[in-house]
Amino acid sequence: MGEKLICNNKKAFHDYFIEERFEAGMVLKGTEVKSLRMGKANLNDSFALVRDGEIFLHNLHINPYDFGNRQNHDPDRLRKLLMHKSEIEKLFGKIREKGYSVVPLRLYFKNGLAKVELGLAKGKKLYDKREDMKKKDQSREMAQALRERSKSH
């Protein structure tokens, strides 16, 4: 069956160094799943926190299902993530260190189940972001120069 991507968090790669990745399941309501199947979700500004040995996803916006009735879900509710206890403890230990946070990188369906890929992230400083942009520009210019050179020959 494979994976079907719902949405990416491109901003996370811009704002953070991703050091480690984890996969987690999500506890969802029926209308949330239907909305996700339609691709109506937004990962921007979302983050995960560990509380009482459980991990929760904050600020994940899933649009209300268009054909839902009064049983429709709250778009910005707290969502519990499903992970092994050892993984949660590992994340909690890292989060307590200064500068680390857990951010969702992408939301997808895997074998029919909604999953979120979490990244253990360390915040980038402004000069790091500038450096990354400079590298990206240089690689783009090199690729463009190579294309132009290959066209002329």
Swiss-Prot record:
UniProt gene name: smpB
Alphabetical UniProt keywords: Cytoplasm, RNA-binding
Record keyword RNA-binding present: yes
Region (Disordered): 129-153
Species: Geobacter metallireducens (strain ATCC 53774 / DSM 7210 / GS-15)
Protein name: SsrA-binding protein
Signal peptide from the UniProt entry: none
HAMAP family associated with the record: SmpB (MF_00023)
CDD domains hit by this protein: SmpB
A Pfam family this chain is assigned to: SmpB
Annotated S-S bridges: none
